[in-house]
Amino acid sequence: MEIVKMHGLGNDFVFIDHFQGAPAELPDYPELARKLCHRQFGVGGDGLIMVLPSDKADARMRILNSDGSEPEMCGNGIRCFARYIYDQGYVSQNPLQVETLAGILTLQLSITGDQVTGVRVDMGEPILKSEQVPVLIQGDPVVGARLDVDGQEFEFTAVSMGNPHCVLFVEDYETLDFERIGPAIEKHPLFPRKTNVEFIIVNSPRELTMKVWERGAGPTLACGTGACASVVAAVLNGRTERKVTVHLPGGDLLIEWGEDNRVYMTGPAAYVFKGVLLEDALS
């Protein structure tokens, strides 16, 4: 089985290409994701991405987290996906459209010569109704709501970018018990489908710093949907302007919540390697 490894700001993915046809005997994809994403016994990655044909868009992206769970969307993953299908010649038009569980997204490639140097994604409108995030608390939107974690109280804003996010504003990371609070909020009963968790420091009205605990993946170097949700939350709380640079451990994303109520994300997509999986890796 051939694979390609890609990353968006260090948020890394193993790609399996079924665009031109899947094998007769399909693998157990959740189990395959757990094996391949393992940092010691597999390839290593935050997720497994399948490249599939679509009758609604130019291609369909299916993604599985490193624990085998299937999220609705992944911002860094879809940038890598767009570059991959363009470079493979599966699409020639620009912009292009990709089908996901969160709907059909439009992506604009920045191309210099014959190289894709960046990808701008129309992430759609943020979902702010509590039952659609979903979060079991009253409020449309849920802004400045209170959350109890092991006796410690936090204020949060709930946003969905096709997948749920709990955004918290903090003063620093030194006093934050990230490894305890992150997973506790991810699995908090207020979030029936679990949630991604973003811890945000506001640097200025045009800059945020973000640390993320991803649902199903844990700490990652970047989260595109999380960066989008964080800017929406920051605007709702009156902390930033609508166009913001978000600093993540893996690098920067430019996020804009447009006056058309759509969120736009711009960032890189890079290759790591391509190779062939041996039978030992699949057994």
Swiss-Prot record:
It catalyses: (2S,6S)-2,6-diaminopimelate = meso-2,6-diaminopimelate. SUPFAM superfamilies: Diaminopimelate epimerase-like (SSF54506). The active site is at C74, C223. GO terms for molecular function: diaminopimelate epimerase activity. Pathway: Amino-acid biosynthesis; L-lysine biosynthesis via DAP pathway; DL-2,6-diaminopimelate from LL-2,6-diaminopimelate: step 1/1. One of its GO terms (cellular component) is cytosol. Keywords: Amino-acid biosynthesis, Cytoplasm, Isomerase, Lysine biosynthesis. It is an enzyme of class 5 (isomerase). One of its GO terms (biological process) is lysine biosynthetic process via diaminopimelate. It comes from the Bacteria. Its EC number is 5.1.1.7. Pfam families: DAP_epimerase (PF01678). Substrate binds at N11, N65, G75, N76, N163, N196, E214, R215, G224, T225. HAMAP family: DAP_epimerase. Homodimer. Belongs to the diaminopimelate epimerase family. This is Diaminopimelate epimerase. The lineage of its organism: Bacteria, Bacillati, Bacillota, Clostridia, Eubacteriales.
